[in-house]
């Protein structure tokens, strides 16, 4: 629970926002008087609603402040001589002191808490926009993702672009793309679009567009994604034709009646997945195809690897039930854990990387995939790791350490200069 000082500070902040909101209302009134069209009328109505909302928050905060002050005045009268708070069931005072009262009124336990997304609603919403604004937003959440998230954490933001508009009574009105930027305490609605859900959905809906524009998340670029993606078609075809260690008998479906291959194993896996495919997954693919999206059909599709260019968070729902795709995403999640472990073992690296000693991309990916209705075949992940793991690890970006001779020369100059100007011990470079 907030302290009296925090409540007063929050009231002051909202009062400052209210002054600005009321000024915007006045500006909108002047604009509407000058040009009384529907667009200006809507703008005036929106700004009045914002001002009323802020005023409502201020009134609520003032009520909370008054309640806290009243509770503080009565606390001495209500306290039991034993030191127990009213309503406490203990017979003797606990060794622990009383802490905050946690308000649960805003929680609804019947609502999803972010574990399961309503992918059909999300895909329907996203495909209602033109492709340019979606790809530009993806750029802001991949290439510039860290800064965008940092600047807007804990808020619901809107992306706008001239390519995205809708006609309202013959008036061209901008159509904004809404996204939520949660913090650690946020509880997401089932159809609420977070950066992770957005990257997952867009990369699954438009993999060829993502590939053409090279839209890669920084967390993917440092784990050798480009090294595997640059010759993906040849790489995956070669891998599919390799003898499969998981099938000992000759394949009955092979044209040459030769040894079973990885392709044969994935065909078996596809048959099992076809029986597991959920109605929601079928509806998501159908709507995406009807909306004009070019979805991948097989792991050997030219753009299939690019569905994971956004991040190793989860497998997109548009390719979840394609044999090998969910496991390919899990392979990238394992690579991310491997790189974080390597960085934590080094003497260099950012403080954030050093803290990631217990990296859990894979466990998170596994949990999310299970919540979407599929169990990973970890034997396929083993095949990926055996055939591509070393090449990916050799392509990791681990940060270049300084040459020992260069470091020694630089440190000597630092030591000399520090001794000239200070009595302190020189720091190490």
Swiss-Prot record:
<feature type="region of interest" description="Viral panhandle binding">
    <location>
        <begin position="1"/>
        <end position="175"/>
    </location>
</feature>
<keyword id="KW-0540">Nuclease</keyword>
<comment type="subunit">
    <text>Homotrimer. Homomultimer. Homomultimerizes and binds to viral genomic RNA to form the nucleocapsid. Interacts with host MAP1LC3B; this interaction participates to the protection of Gn from virus-triggered autophagy. Interacts with host SNAP29; this interaction participates to the protection of glycoprotein N from virus-triggered autophagy. Interacts (via N-terminus) with host RPS19; this interaction probably mediates the loading of the 40S ribosomal subunit on viral capped mRNA during N-mediated translation initiation. Interacts with the viral RdRp. Interacts with host SUMO1 (via N-terminus).</text>
</comment>
<feature type="site" description="Important for the endonuclease activity">
    <location>
        <position position="88"/>
    </location>
</feature>
<keyword id="KW-1035">Host cytoplasm</keyword>
<dbReference type="GO" id="GO:0019013">
    <property type="term" value="C:viral nucleocapsid"/>
</dbReference>
<keyword id="KW-0694">RNA-binding</keyword>
<feature type="short sequence motif" description="YxxL">
    <location>
        <begin position="178"/>
        <end position="181"/>
    </location>
</feature>
<comment type="function">
    <text>Encapsidates the genome protecting it from nucleases. The encapsidated genomic RNA is termed the nucleocapsid (NC) and serves as template for transcription and replication. The nucleocapsid has a left-handed helical structure. As a trimer, specifically binds and acts as a chaperone to unwind the panhandle structure formed by the viral RNA (vRNA) termini. Involved in the transcription and replication initiation of vRNA by mediating primer annealing. Plays a role in cap snatching by sequestering capped RNAs in P bodies for use by the viral RdRp during transcription initiation.</text>
</comment>
<keyword id="KW-0255">Endonuclease</keyword>
<feature type="site" description="Important for the endonuclease activity">
    <location>
        <position position="103"/>
    </location>
</feature>
<keyword id="KW-0143">Chaperone</keyword>
<keyword id="KW-0378">Hydrolase</keyword>
<feature type="region of interest" description="Disordered">
    <location>
        <begin position="27"/>
        <end position="46"/>
    </location>
</feature>
<dbReference type="GO" id="GO:0003723">
    <property type="term" value="F:RNA binding"/>
</dbReference>
<keyword id="KW-0687">Ribonucleoprotein</keyword>
<feature type="region of interest" description="Interaction with host RPS19">
    <location>
        <begin position="150"/>
        <end position="175"/>
    </location>
</feature>
<keyword id="KW-0543">Viral nucleoprotein</keyword>
<keyword id="KW-1040">Host Golgi apparatus</keyword>
<dbReference type="Pfam" id="PF00846">
    <property type="entry name" value="Hanta_nucleocap"/>
</dbReference>
<comment type="similarity">
    <text>Belongs to the hantavirus nucleocapsid protein family.</text>
</comment>
<dbReference type="GO" id="GO:0004519">
    <property type="term" value="F:endonuclease activity"/>
</dbReference>
<feature type="region of interest" description="Homomultimerization">
    <location>
        <begin position="373"/>
        <end position="421"/>
    </location>
</feature>
<keyword id="KW-0175">Coiled coil</keyword>
<feature type="region of interest" description="Homomultimerization">
    <location>
        <begin position="1"/>
        <end position="79"/>
    </location>
</feature>
<protein>
    <recommendedName>
        <fullName>Nucleoprotein</fullName>
        <ecNumber>3.1.-.-</ecNumber>
    </recommendedName>
</protein>
<feature type="region of interest" description="Viral RNA-binding">
    <location>
        <begin position="175"/>
        <end position="217"/>
    </location>
</feature>
<dbReference type="GO" id="GO:0044220">
    <property type="term" value="C:host cell perinuclear region of cytoplasm"/>
</dbReference>
<feature type="region of interest" description="Interaction with host DAXX">
    <location>
        <begin position="373"/>
        <end position="429"/>
    </location>
</feature>
<keyword id="KW-0946">Virion</keyword>
<dbReference type="InterPro" id="IPR002214">
    <property type="entry name" value="Hanta_nucleocap"/>
</dbReference>
<dbReference type="GO" id="GO:0044177">
    <property type="term" value="C:host cell Golgi apparatus"/>
</dbReference>
<dbReference type="GO" id="GO:1990904">
    <property type="term" value="C:ribonucleoprotein complex"/>
</dbReference>
<feature type="region of interest" description="Interaction with glycoprotein N">
    <location>
        <begin position="80"/>
        <end position="248"/>
    </location>
</feature>
<feature type="region of interest" description="Homomultimerization">
    <location>
        <begin position="100"/>
        <end position="125"/>
    </location>
</feature>
<feature type="coiled-coil region">
    <location>
        <begin position="4"/>
        <end position="31"/>
    </location>
</feature>
<feature type="region of interest" description="RdRP binding">
    <location>
        <begin position="1"/>
        <end position="50"/>
    </location>
</feature>
<feature type="region of interest" description="Interaction with host UBE2I/UBC9">
    <location>
        <begin position="188"/>
        <end position="191"/>
    </location>
</feature>
<feature type="region of interest" description="Chaperone activity">
    <location>
        <begin position="1"/>
        <end position="100"/>
    </location>
</feature>
């Amino acid at each position: 629970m907030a302290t009296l000082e925090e409540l007063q500070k929050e009231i002051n902040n909202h009062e400052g926002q209210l002054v600005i909101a009321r000024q915007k209302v006045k500006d909108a009134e002047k604009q509407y008087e000058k040009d009384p069209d529907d667009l200006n009328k809507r703008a005036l109505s929106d700004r009045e609603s914002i001002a009323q909302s802020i005023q409502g928050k201020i009134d609520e905060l003032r009520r909370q402040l008054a309640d806290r002050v009243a509770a503080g005045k009565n606390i001495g009268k209500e306290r039991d001589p034993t030191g127990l708070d009213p309503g406490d069931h203990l017979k003797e005072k606990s060794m622990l002191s009383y802490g905050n009262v946690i308000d649960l009124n805003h929680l609804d336990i019947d609502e999803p808490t972010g574990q399961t997304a309503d992918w059909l609603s999300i895909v329907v919403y996203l495909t209602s926009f033109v492709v340019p604004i979606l790809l530009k937003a993806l750029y802001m959440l991949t290439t510039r993702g860290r800064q965008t998230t940092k600047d807007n954490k804990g808020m619901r933001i809107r992306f706008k672009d001239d390519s995205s508009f809708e006609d309202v009574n013959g008036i061209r009105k901008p159509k904004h793309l809404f996204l939520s930027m949660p913090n650690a305490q946020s509880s997401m609605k089932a159809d609420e679009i977070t950066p992770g859900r957005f990257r997952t959905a867009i990369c699954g809906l438009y993999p060829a567009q993502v590939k053409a524009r090279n839209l890669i998340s920084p967390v993917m670029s440092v784990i050798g994604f480009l090294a595997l993606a640059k010759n993906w078609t040849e790489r995956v075809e070669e891998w599919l034709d390799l003898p499969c260690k998981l099938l000992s008998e000759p394949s009955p479906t092979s044209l040459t009646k030769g040894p079973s291959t990885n392709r044969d194993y994935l065909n078996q896996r596809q048959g099992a997945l076809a029986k597991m495919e959920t109605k929601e997954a079928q509806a998501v693919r159908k709507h995406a195809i009807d909306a004009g999206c070019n979805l991948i059909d097989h792991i050997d599709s030219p753009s299939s690897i690019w569905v994971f260019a956004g991040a190793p968070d989860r497998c997109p729902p548009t390719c979840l039930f394609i044999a090998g795709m969910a496991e390919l995403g899990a392979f990238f999640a394992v690579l991310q854990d491997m790189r974080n472990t390597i960085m934590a073992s080094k003497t260099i690296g950012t403080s954030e990387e050093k803290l990631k000693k217990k990296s859990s991309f894979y466990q998170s990916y596994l949990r999310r995939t299970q919540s979407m209705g599929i169990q990973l075949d970890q034997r396929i992940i083993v095949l990926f790791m055996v055939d591509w793991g070393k090449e990916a690890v050799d392509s990791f970006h681990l940060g270049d350490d300084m040459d020992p001779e260069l470091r020694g020369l630089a440190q000597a100059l630092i030591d000399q200069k520090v001794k000239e100007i200070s009595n302190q011990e020189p720091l190490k470079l």
